Every structure is written in structure tokens, then in C-alpha cells.
């Protein structure tokens, strides 16, 4: 019983740390305004909530289009497909993350 409680406590702590770091990253991104003449024109503007959702669910669609580029797969063991990711998407821990 104690080990189950300890495991649950550790899991909650880990989720809190991850959520806090993700929230700080999103807050930092809010200050960055995209100008049409920027070099980031290939990036599709995604609102903060969708960006957070797309970090965990690579197949979520926004306005009928996938959030991540076509061909960006992170489920391979060696992450060899990370070179196919573009537009700010990278493979981290077998997840497609928007950087």
C-alpha cells in the first residue's frame, strides 16, 4: 500500500513539473509576435491551447489540417524520422514536439 501511494505521489510530482515547464514555455512564446515577413513563414500559427494539445497528440487537426507536417513520425526506435520533421516540430522521447 505504501509503495502504491509513493508511486502515485511521484507521478503527480512529475506531472506538476512537466505542466509547469510547458506553461512557462507557452508563456514565453506569447511574447513572440509573428510578422508576415519573418523567416518563420512556413510555420502555421497555432493558438496556445492547440499547441499544447498537438504536443501530445500528433494527429489532432486544426481546420482540417494536421498540426504537424506530413511525414513527421517519432514512433521509430532510433528517431531516424526526426529529419523529416519541419516547421518547428522535433522528436523528443518518441513524441512530436513543437519547438
Curated annotation (Swiss-Prot):
Keywords: Disulfide bond, Secreted, Signal, Toxin. Expressed by the venom gland. It is found in: Secreted. One of its GO terms (molecular function) is toxin activity. One of its GO terms (cellular component) is extracellular region. Residues 1-23 form the signal peptide. This is U1-theraphotoxin-Lsp1b. Toxin that causes irreversible contractile paralysis into adult Aedes aegypti resulting in 100% mortality after 24 hours. Disulfide bonds join 54-67, 58-91, 72-74, 85-96. Residues 24-50 form a propeptide.
